[in-house]
Structure formats: structure tokens, C-alpha cells
């Protein structure tokens, strides 16, 4: 970590804790800043604030008092989840207090080069794939960012010989100014988080900030399947490396079932460790990064063939009596489940789906359900899911929980079948989040395996 004097004796307000705010507070304190942390969660319910107070950091909890900004702060570090129309943020902007993001703070002190990955879908899987391939190739890749490891914490241990492989959300990117990765990946761009950004155009603008400071000596990897990529590519100074599953490009591409970089065949799509058309795209982006990083083709192929997915993201859980289980609890919308289904033989597939509907068009799912062996339906959206199943002429059963659904699916399954949890709905009608929903699937698998 670089020891910089930019924040020495500067009064800095950390707005919002969570993992990133806590990490930023500790880093800035180490750099000699005079830190105040403000979090909306009450102090007695806030272990992170309690821990920071024990370290001598000033904490103010329970609300966001606008008058706090009258204390002449020289910087604000804003939690990514707090929007820019928040009264505290608006007041800071009115007072011309510079607002930093936690990832930019990490960038300022990082000795290690950064590979940044953003996009609407596939960020976590691609980030993990890239780190796995780089590490297998003898490099030292450190996961950081939106993947659960705050960048400002990871950077404190990183050295010049490391590489920070950083997952970046639109929330994290919208406020960056100086941030400059050496390699950036945009997996795809879909209309999501519009409640935060206001419009698709503003959402894309936030994602596009990943390349704002890049030069021709840096590399920007874009999804050439999307027309918007061609438009955006004309506006960057970075060297663009495209990837595509639909056409041959001057980068990474799929042709006749083989994944290539330039003219070099790397791996057959059927040899990838995770199924689905979206995972071919993720693998192509990974191949582009790996080749730019000097990783040998055989290492890339070996890693991609053994990659088992990320937890809750089309995760291959295992087999019981030659019946394979996949946990795709992260699929909370129709598009995600459609992509998951693309990797399987429907005639041997039992799909567990349903949950809280957030405006899905279930008719869009009907073509992807055709030929399914069976559906197990659950949750608030059950009646709409049943109508989709009927239109696809797929038989179904109803369950009251993921555990019950998994047990039913296993009773119906035969040797060679696959059981897939890919809900196409949010979890909040039955579970606090998709992780808890997926964990119940994993726990039920463990019980079934123990009884087998």
C-alpha cells in the first residue's frame, strides 16, 4: 500500500457503514485522517460502529443529521447504496465538499494494478473466473470490491506484484473521478437499477465511468453481441477488445462450438465447467483478460473446464445416484432463468421456480419451458408460474418451501436427470434474500445425500 499524505489531518465524514464504510474508516484513520462515521442503524444494533468506536473513531448512529455537515468536513466518503438525492449528499454537494467513493479511495493507495469488472449480469462469475485463471497461471490475483471483499481493506495488504480483480457495481462507479483500471470488462448492459439511476441512459453512464480515465495503453473488453457496445466503443480512449458468441471478432469469440482468442482455439464450449449461454460469454471475457495478462492457453482451458460456478449462481452442487443438482438461487428474474435453462436438456430437467414477482412477464418464459420433464412451483407467484407451465404443457407440483420442492424433485428424478433451482423471482415472500433461499437448497441436498 502506498502511504499518501493527501488525507493527513483532514476531517472526513464516512456516510453509511456496511463492509465498505467500515474498511474506508479504518484505512483513512491509518492514513492520518480525522474520521467521523455516520450510520442510520442505531448504535446498540450496530457492531461495526461499536468496533470503530473502540478503535477511537468517532461514530454518530441512528440517523443522518444534515446539520452534521456544518462541522467543516473536507471530504465525504459515501456508501454506494446511498443515492445522490439523499439530503446529506445533496447538502455536501451544495457545500462543495468533495465526495469520494470507497473504490476510488482504494485506487489512490493501491500499488497493485487493477482489473475492473462491471456489467448488469455475470459480474461475480466473471470476476471469480478471472482470479482463478490468473492464480493458476502463477500470478497473485486478489478478489475485491462488490464481490464481498471491500477494496479499501484488500488494498492495505496488496503489493505491487499483486493484481486486484475488482467487481464494480454501477453504485460504486457513478461517483468515481480518478479511478483507472489497467483492464476493464463490461459483461453486458441491461435496464436494471433504474430506481436508483432514474433512466437506462444514466445507468449506462455510471457503468461507462469504469473507462473514463483509461488511455490507449489500457484495455477495455466489451460484449460485441450488444449494439450498444459498438456505439460506446467509439467514445473511449482505451484499446477495445471485443468478445462475442454470435460472430467472429478481433478478440474472443465462439465459432462452431469452440472458444477462440484471435485465431487460437482455447476450449470447446462443451468442456466448460458451468453450463449456459451466459457462461460462454463470461468465459470469453475471462479468456480475453487472461491472454492480455500472459496466461498460457492450456492453463486457461484447464481452469475453465474445472470451474464449478459461484455459490447461488448456477452452482453445480453435486450428484446423488447420478442425479445432478444446480443451485441458481441468484436468478431473480425471467432473463436470468432463461439463460440458466439454455445450458440443459429440458427432457432430463426438473425445474424449481417461483417466489416474489417483481413485474415479470411470465409468458416470455414459456418457450424456454417447453419439453421440461417437471416443474416444482412455489411462492407468491405460483399461480402465474402455473399458467406459464400450462401454456408450455409441462406438468407441475406445488411446494411450500425450497426444502420441500427439492425433496419432491428428488423423488421424481431418475438416473441422468438434473434438478435446477432457478426461481425467476425474488426471494422476499419466503426468505430474507436469495442467499438464504439457496442455502436451504444446499442443506436439503446434504440431507438427501446423507440418506442415500
Curated annotation (Swiss-Prot):
Which Gene3D superfamilies does the record match to this protein? Mur ligase, C-terminal domain, Mur-like, catalytic domain, NAD(P)-binding Rossmann-like Domain
GO molecular function per UniProt: ATP binding; UDP-N-acetylmuramoylalanine-D-glutamate ligase activity
Q: What are the UniProt keywords, alphabetically?
A: ATP-binding, Cell cycle, Cell division, Cell shape, Cell wall biogenesis/degradation, Cytoplasm, Ligase, Nucleotide-binding, Peptidoglycan synthesis
Q: Note whether Transport occurs among the keywords.
A: no
One biological process term in Gene Ontology: regulation of cell shape
**Which locations, inside or outside the cell, does it occupy?**
Cytoplasm
- Keyword match DNA repair: no
Looking at its record, which EC class is this enzyme? Answer: ligase
Listed EC numbers = 6.3.2.9
The record, for Pfam families, names: Mur_ligase_C, Mur_ligase_M, MurD-like_N
Q: Which family does it belong to?
A: Belongs to the MurCDEF family.
What role is this protein assigned?
A: Cell wall formation. Catalyzes the addition of glutamate to the nucleotide precursor UDP-N-acetylmuramoyl-L-alanine (UMA).
Q: Which protein is depicted?
A: UDP-N-acetylmuramoylalanine--D-glutamate ligase
Amino acid at each position: 500500500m502506498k502511504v499518501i499524505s493527501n488525507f493527513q489531518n483532514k476531517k472526513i465524514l464516512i456516510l453509511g457503514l456496511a463492509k465498505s464504510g467500515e474498511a474506508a474508516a479504518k484505512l483513512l484513520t491509518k492514513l492520518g485522517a480525522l474520521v467521523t462515521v455516520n450510520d442510520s442503524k442505531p448504535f446498540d444494533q450496530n457492531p461495526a460502529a461499536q468496533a470503530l468506536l473502540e478503535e477511537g473513531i468517532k461514530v454518530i448512529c441512528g440517523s443522518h443529521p444534515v446539520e452534521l455537515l456544518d462541522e467543516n468536513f473536507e471530504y465525504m466518503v459515501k456508501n454506494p447504496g446511498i443515492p445522490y438525492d439523499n439530503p446529506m449528499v445533496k447538502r455536501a454537494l451544495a457545500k462543495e465538499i468533495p465526495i469520494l467513493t470507497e473504490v476510488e479511495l482504494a485506487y489512490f493507495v493501491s500499488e497493485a494494478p487493477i482489473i475492473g469488472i462491471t456489467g448488469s449480469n455475470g459480474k461475480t462469475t466473471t470476476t471469480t473466473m478471472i482470479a482463478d485463471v490468473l492464480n493458476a497461471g502463477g500470478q497473485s490475483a486478489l478478489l475485491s470490491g462488490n464481490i464481498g471483499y471491500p477494496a479499501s481493506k484488500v488494498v492495505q495488504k496488496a503489493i505491487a506484484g499483486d493484481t486486484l480483480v475488482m467487481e464494480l457495481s454501477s453504485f460504486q462507479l457513478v461517483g468515481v473521478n480518478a479511478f483507472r483500471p489497467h483492464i476493464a470488462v463490461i459483461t453486458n448492459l441491461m435496464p436494471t437499477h433504474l430506481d436508483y439511476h432514474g433512466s437506462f441512459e444514466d445507468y449506462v453512464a455510471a457503468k461507462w465511468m469504469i473507462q473514463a480515465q483509461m488511455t490507449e495503453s489500457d484495455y477495455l473488453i466489451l460484449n460485441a453481441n450488444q449494439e450498444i457496445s459498438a456505439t460506446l466503443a467509439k467514445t473511449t480512449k482505451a484499446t477495445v477488445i471485443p468478445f462475442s458468441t454470435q460472430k467472429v471478432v478481433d478478440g474472443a469469440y465462439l465459432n462452431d462450438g469452440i472458444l477462440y482468442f484471435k485465431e487460437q482455439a482455447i476450449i470447446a464450449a462443451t468442456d466448460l465447467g458451468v453450463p449456459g449461454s451466459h457462461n460462454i460469454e463470461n468465459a470469453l471475457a475471462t479468456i480475453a483478460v487472461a491472454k492480455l495478462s500472459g496466461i498460457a492457453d492450456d492453463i486457461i482451458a484447464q481452469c475453465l473446464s474445472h470451474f464449478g460456478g459461484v455459490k447461488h449462481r448456477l452452482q453445480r452442487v453435486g450428484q446423488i445416484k447420478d442425479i445432478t443438482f444446480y443451485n441458481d438461487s441468484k436468478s431473480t428474474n425471467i432473463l436470468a432463468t432463461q439463460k440458466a435453462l439454455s445450458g440443459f436438456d429440458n427432457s432430463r430437467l426438473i425445474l424449481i421456480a417461483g417466489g416474489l414477482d417483481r413485474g415479470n412477464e411470465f409468458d416470455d418464459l414459456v418457450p424456454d419451458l417447453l419439453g421440461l420433464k417437471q416443474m416444482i412451483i412455489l411462492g407468491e407467484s405460483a399461480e402465474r408460474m402455473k399458467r406459464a407451465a400450462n401454456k408450455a404443457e409441462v406438468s407441475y407440483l406445488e411446494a411450500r418451501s425450497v426444502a420441500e420442492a427439492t425433496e419432491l424433485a428428488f423423488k421424481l428424478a431418475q438416473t441422468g436427470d438434473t434438478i435446477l433451482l432457478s426461481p425467476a423471482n425474488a426471494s422476499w415472500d419466503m426468505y430474507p434474500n436469495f442467499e438464504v433461499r439457496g442455502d436451504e437448497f444446499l442443506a436439503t441436498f446434504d440431507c438427501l445425500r446423507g440418506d442415500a
